Amino acid sequence: MIQPQTHLNVADNSGARELMCIRIIGASNRRYAHIGDVIVAVIKEAVPNMPLERSEVVRAVIVRTCKELKRDNGMIIRYDDNAAVVIDQEGNPKGTRIFGAIARELRQLNFTKIVSLAPEVL
């Protein structure tokens, strides 16, 4: 469950290290975002000499949350951190590598490029 002011780790090599959610894309009054939702975020911490800089506003898709994700078959998945991948306007990742495991639900939400770059899909 990601809401505005939540800090997230960045799970790619785009140059950002930490994001802060400022808006959830979708319905105008959505309170929480879950895995697969697109958010608007500001970069709070960045790697020096990279294209993305601190205080830059970006779009990101959530790939891991500490809140449990319950699947239709009864399986419950919970991650150790909240993480997102920085994307462009078309939904393609800005980085070329993805770090850590991501959820299978991203494939159904047409984030196939992120799924193909991920080392592990749960």
Curated annotation (Swiss-Prot):
SMART domains: Ribosomal_L14
GO cellular component, one term: chloroplast
HAMAP family: Ribosomal_uL14
Matches recorded under SUPFAM superfamilies: Ribosomal protein L14
Family designation: Belongs to the universal ribosomal protein uL14 family.
Membrane-spanning parts: none
Gene3D superfamilies: Ribosomal protein L14
Summary of subunit composition and partner proteins: Part of the 50S ribosomal subunit.
Pfam families reported for this sequence: Ribosomal_L14 (PF00238)
Function: Binds to 23S rRNA.
Species of provenance: Coffea arabica
Primary localization class, coarse: plastid
Location of this chain's protein in the cell: Plastid, Chloroplast
Keywords: Chloroplast, Plastid, Ribonucleoprotein, Ribosomal protein, RNA-binding, rRNA-binding
Name assigned to this protein: Large ribosomal subunit protein uL14c
InterPro entries: Ribosomal_uL14, Ribosomal_uL14_bac-type, Ribosomal_uL14_CS, Ribosomal_uL14_sf
Superkingdom: Eukaryota
GO BP term (any one): translation
Gene Ontology MF terms in the entry: large ribosomal subunit rRNA binding; structural constituent of ribosome
